[in-house]
């Protein structure tokens, strides 16, 4: 079985802590002994800022942030902000009850992270 969610429109985030990515939430079913493979695909993000900008991406499971995260930063403060495709893949064991998976993101070093093309969250189990 597979589940899928996708963003629409332009989204931005300037928080230094993880906040939910609008539209990227799934509820995976119960199923002890099975692992769901969760993929967060952010194909064209970029970050703006004055101190080597970048972004971090992760997922929460029932509100708790997974320790597995993906991130990008530029090598220095760029004169123009290029796209940095970022993908996170994490295994989440199914439990005795359904679990909510929410994509989260944050800027690093005071930067603003922007996506203006669809990002997706999927689960296969």
What are the roles of these predicted feature ranges?
Residues 19-23, 66:
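Local beta-strand/beta-hairpin segments that build beta-sheet-rich folds
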Residues 6-15, 28-125:
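Terminal beta-strand-rich extracellular "head" domains
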Residues 1-3:
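Extracellular receptor-binding modules and their adjoining Ser/Thr/Gly/Asp/Asn-rich linkers
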């Amino acid at each position: 079985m597979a589940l899928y969610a996708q963003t629409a429109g332009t989204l931005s985030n300037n928080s230094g802590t993880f906040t939910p990515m609008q539209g990227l939430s799934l509820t995976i079913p119960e199923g002890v002994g099975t692992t769901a493979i969760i993929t967060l695909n952010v194909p064209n993000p970029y970050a703006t800022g004055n101190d080597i900008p970048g972004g971090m991406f992760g997922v929460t499971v029932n509100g708790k942030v997974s320790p597995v995260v993906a991130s990008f930063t530029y090598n220095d403060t760029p004169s123009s902000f290029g796209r940095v495709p970022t993908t996170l893949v994490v295994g989440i064991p199914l439990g005795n009850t359904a679990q909510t998976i929410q994509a989260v993101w944050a800027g690093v070093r005071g930067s603003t992270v922007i996506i203006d093309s669809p990002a997706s969250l999927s689960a296969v189990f």
